[in-house]
């Protein structure tokens, strides 16, 4: 797939407690802010929040499935708002630049919550596979 500015893809997912538990198991990130409601209630967040990287991992899924499967070269991320279990989030990646001298593409990456607020923003650089 030849990528050009304006090409984009999206993926939505409702985050479950099982997703959070499995992500914690796979990554060994057992921070109680994500897993222990009693602990998390005492924090500035007032309850458990989803691992930021769990939300960001949907960006990888979009790039790998909706944009022809280019190879990740880099990614910047800003975690703007917390994600809560039960929220439906949508990851979107949009081509904003294609280098003329090399096959390198820059993507704007955004994860939004179900009311359209940005929760994660950033940019990715990718190498198209063809």
Name these PLM-found stretches.
Residues 1-70:
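Hot-dog-fold acyl-thioester-processing enzymes
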Residues 65-91:
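Mid-chain, well-packed structural core segment of small domains
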Residues 11-15, 77, 124-126:
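Generic detection of short hydrophobic beta-strand segments and adjacent strand-loop junctions
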Residues 28-29, 40, 69, 74-75, ...:
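Short, charged/polar low-complexity linear motifs in solvent-exposed/disordered segments
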Residues 1-8, 83-130:
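HotDog/MaoC-like acyl-thioester-processing domains
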Residues 31, 37-42, 61-62, 77, ...:
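Short, surface-exposed, polar/charged, turn-prone segments marking secondary-structure boundaries
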């Amino acid at each position: 797939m030849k990528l050009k500015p304006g090409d984009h893809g999206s993926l939505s997912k409702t985050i479950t407690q099982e997703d959070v538990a499995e992500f914690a198991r796979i990554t060994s990130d057992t921070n109680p802010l994500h897993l222990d409601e009693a602990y998390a209630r005492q924090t500035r967040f007032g309850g458990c929040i989803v691992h930021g990287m769990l939300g960001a991992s949907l960006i990888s899924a979009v790039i790998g499935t909706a944009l022809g499967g280019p190879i990740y070269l880099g990614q910047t991320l800003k975690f703007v708002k917390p994600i809560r279990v039960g929220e439906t989030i949508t990851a979107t990646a949009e081509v904003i630049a294609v280098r003329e001298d090399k096959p390198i593409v820059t993507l704007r990456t955004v994860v939004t919550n179900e009311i359209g607020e940005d929760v994660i923003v950033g940019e990715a650089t990718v190498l198209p596979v063809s």
